[in-house]
């Protein structure tokens, strides 16, 4: 199974997280417009990535005839629901520059949790899930 598109989206997601971290370190209030823009762009990539996984990747793996990959796929899909929901709530809540300026420390606290979880998930997929798929 060719998963190059998924891997490319992981690079985009990880780069987006890195950019948000850099902007946050430079000052949330001072870079609120850029942070809101980057967060919206990241949300778009993540939303698209999740939709493609749900419509194509997970169903393909679950019907692949490979029990190990089918179980792994179901587990990853289930695990991602909580991470995805938290990220979507975060992006909706903090995708506005005025709100970012008003509550920079609240943004930082939420971002440290949500973005850390998304980052960890991408790294885990890159390390465990995608190599297993490519070995098919």
Set out the residue ranges of the language-model regions:
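Small-residue-biased structural context
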Residues: 1-136
């Amino acid at each position: 199974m060719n998963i190059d598109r998924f891997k490319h989206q992981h690079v985009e997601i990880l780069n987006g997280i890195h950019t948000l971290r850099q902007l946050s370190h430079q000052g949330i209030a001072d870079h609120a417009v850029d942070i809101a823009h980057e967060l919206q762009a990241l949300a778009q990539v993540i939303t698209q990535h999740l939709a493609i996984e749900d419509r194509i990747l997970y169903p393909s793996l679950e019907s692949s005839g490979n029990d190990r990959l089918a179980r792994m796929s179901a587990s990853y899909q289930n695990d991602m629901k909580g991470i995805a929901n938290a990220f979507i709530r975060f992006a909706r809540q903090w995708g506005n520059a005025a709100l970012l300026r008003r509550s920079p420390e609240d943004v930082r606290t939420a971002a440290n949790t949500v973005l850390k979880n998304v980052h960890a998930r991408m790294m885990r997929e890159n390390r465990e899930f995608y190599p297993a798929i490519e070995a098919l």
